[in-house]
Amino acid sequence: SKDAFDSYLFLDGKTKDNTTYPNTDVAVMESSKNDNLPHLNIQDLLKVRDKRLALTIDSVLCYGDGWPRIAGGQPMTSSSGYGICKYDNVAIDPNYRQQTSSNYTSAPLYWLAVIYLNYAEAKAELGTISNDDLNNTINLLKDRAGLPHITIDVADAGDNNMGVEPLIWEIRRERRCELMFDNDFRYWDLIRWHQLDKLDNSTNPDILLGANVVNDSSIDHEKSGDYLDGSTGRVRAFEAKHYLYPIPSGQITLNPKLEQNPLWKKN
């Protein structure tokens, strides 16, 4: 989504509202790749952001009838327009790159980055984190991303919508960007932070907005202004009970002493 895209900082370590880099989100129409099919390209937008973004999101937008990001391959499409390229290994046979049943790309089972992120977050939440801690964890990831280091006195970035201290917010941002699309980390993080309400598109109507497609005049549906709108015809409502799963009714039948989780009880 655009919200996820915009969570990645610019190379000066600032958000789109504060950066010294060009902060346009308008894609450029071109027809120079894969059989000269016209497509919107965001390569210039990726160049000025956190280096991880270009390794996560494809430089070509795909929507509508789709776009074959692999030459000769099947068209790919996305409700947000953003195509995923993370873990796509261009060195392997194209036939395997676009199959879900057999792909020879190595996938991590556990990340050193997760250890860094967990440690930094725990220390920050306890109020015991130091600049040395940041240099041994978060700032190592910043180096790889081509971003400036942060300190314990990091300034408010202006996009904090969780009501937490600026340092906690930046650690959460780092976690989001580093682990984007990985193993449902984001979903479970939002649960433990009690922030699932941010995904409710009835109260946050822009949360499912996608890419800026103003330069493609052929699109006449599923848009909100200049942006693709993935929420068209879809309602994603939040309820507090979603922080817990219900205990299966069969288990309660087996053990009547089990009590259903709060808010899942039938009247």
Model-derived segments and spans:
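Acidic/polar-rich alpha-helix caps and helix-coil junctions
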Residues: 6-267
